[in-house]
A protein has these predicted regions:
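Alpha-helical transmembrane segments of multi-pass small-molecule/ion transporters
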Residues: 1-314
Length: 314
């Protein structure tokens, strides 16, 4: 019973905060415009500042773990390749890009940090997990959505250059890189700067979760519902079932294992829908998968945490 309570204490506050966001949207406290701006603020300011704070305050040599970084990178890469292979079971070629992206692309930044903070009190290994997986998420999302685009256009040098620039200038990546550099150079932080950074960083998790909940659209879309269910099952259960045992065998425990779980088994990020629409896809498969995984992850993540706690891995 204590293990179940531990798991519920880790997951329920996260999802209740998201539900509050949905409630605030329904009663008119938040509207679409404000929610969009809140999402942008969290993505471009609060979340990078939080990551900068945690990394800049830590000893880089103690935080860096090449084994963990490589595992996250290759687990992400193999997950994408496996889902790409499975996508060929879909008859409609134009749906494959959405299926691949929705089945592998986690909300690693907001949910990952929220879970690890909720359990351990700080972002822990989340920044290293993010720097190993998020750039690959973005690169491969562009690739698969371009390759399986309904009105496919040639992938030119300018297209590749623009994509590379977007990845390098990603605010989350910049926050991590700046924090790591600050830690390596051991630059002192004046009290005024430290407190200002803390005041902004503390906004990231609650605002991010509220915005995620407020962005949720429970639209019923019969089209593509079966591949959406398949993508959700892969996202919440399949990838974690394959790679978590490998992570355990390799010796990952505690916050590292929780970070790996979130990378593999958390909900599909809402930004995947935005990217799919902006790259010429219809979007219903992605929207359905975001909806299913957001609802389902409240139960599946609780199950995974309960299982790992019972087995004394966390």
């Amino acid at each position: 019973m204590s293990n179940l309570i531990f798991s519920l204490n880790a997951t329920m506050p996260i999802f209740l905060t998201m539900i509050l966001g949905l409630f605030f949207r329904k009663v008119g406290i938040l509207d679409e415009s404000f929610t969009s701006k809140m999402n942008k603020f969290v993505f471009k300011i609060a979340l990078p500042v939080l990551l900068f704070q945690d990394l800049s305050d830590s000893d880089f040599s103690a935080v860096w773990d090449i084994k963990f970084v490589l595992f996250c990178f290759f687990a992400t890469l193999l997950s994408i390749l496996a889902v790409w292979g499975l996508s060929h079971l879909l008859k409609e070629r134009s749906a494959r890009g959405e299926f691949i992206q929705a089945a592998y692309r986690s909300s690693a930044a907001i949910l990952g940090i929220a879970f690890i903070q909720n359990i351990y009190g700080n972002s822990g290994m989340a920044p290293l997990m993010i720097i190993s997986s998020v750039p690959l998420y973005n690169i491969m999302a562009v690739v698969v959505l371009a390759v399986f685009r309904p009105e496919r256009e040639e992938i030119t040098a300018d297209f590749v250059k623009k994509t590379a620039k977007n990845i390098v200038t990603n605010p989350i990546i910049l926050g991590i890189a700046t924090g790591l550099l600050w830690s390596v150079l051991r630059i002192p932080k004046p009290v005024i700067l430290q407190k200002t950074v803390q005041n902004i960083a503390v906004l990231a998790t609650p605002l991010g979760l509220i915005a995620m909940g407020a962005s949720f659209e429970a639209k019923s879309a019969a089209k593509n519902i079966r591949p959406s269910i398949a993508a959700a099952a892969i996202k919440l259960v399949g990838l974690a079932a394959v790679f978590l045992p490998i992570a355990v065998i390799l010796g990952f425990r505690q916050e590292k294992l929780v970070a790996i779980l979130v990378m593999l088994g958390s909900a599909t990020t809402v930004s995947s829908f935005i990217m799919a629409k902006n790259m010429g896809h219809e979007g219903s498969l992605t929207a359905n998968t975001v909806m299913l995984t957001t609802c389902g992850s409240a139960f599946t993540l609780t199950f995974w945490l309960y299982l790992m706690k019972t087995l004394a891995f966390i």
